[in-house]
């Protein structure tokens, strides 16, 4: 039996990335940071290579919860489809890179899971127009590349997983 991958595709270098270290200098770090109380439940990607979409959906749900103390699932399948649009692989369960997923959240946003549910058999179908209209109201404003462990730890200490 062949080993099954989860669908992560390494990011290609992109000189257009905003670097995290240009935003804030590294601060004195706490001994421990635990953000789990603000995180939504980890969801099962099942047999689909949608790990980046699952991770990014969880991250967006975290950010939403920090703003309004309410959890609502965003559509992992919507994110996964649009990641693969950028990569030109919508017809395949090809996996995707985190950068393309983040670009998707910046450009298209994410609709709610109840609008475009995680039905694996629909992974290659374009989401409905209403999904894109809803998603436009739910975009991230910016993203910044993290290049080192100290930058990652600083980011976590500032409350950004």
Q: What are these model-derived regions, one by one?
A:
Residues 1-33:
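N-terminal zymogen propeptides
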Residues 22, 37, 81:
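Pocket-edge structural micro-motifs
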Residues 45-69:
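Alpha-helical support elements that line or immediately flank enzyme active sites
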């Amino acid at each position: 039996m062949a080993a099954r991958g989860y669908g992560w595709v390494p990011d290609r270098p992109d000189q257009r990335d905003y670097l995290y270290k240009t935003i804030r200098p590294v601060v004195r770090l706490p001994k421990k940071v635990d953000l789990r109380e603000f995180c939504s439940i980890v969801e099962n990607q099942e047999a689909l290579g949608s790990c980046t979409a699952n991770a990014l959906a969880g991250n967006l749900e975290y950010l939403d919860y920090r703003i309004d103390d309410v959890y609502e699932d965003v559509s992992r399948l919507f994110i996964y489809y649009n990641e693969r649009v950028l990569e030109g692989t919508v017809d395949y369960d090809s996996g995707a890179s985190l950068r393309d997923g983040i670009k998707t959240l910046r450009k298209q946003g994410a609709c709610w899971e109840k609008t475009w549910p995680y039905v694996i058999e629909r992974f290659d179908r374009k989401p409905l127009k209403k999904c894109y209209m809803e998603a436009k109201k739910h975009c991230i404003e910016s993203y910044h590349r993290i290049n080192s462990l100290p930058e990652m730890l600083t980011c976590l200490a500032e409350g950004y997983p």
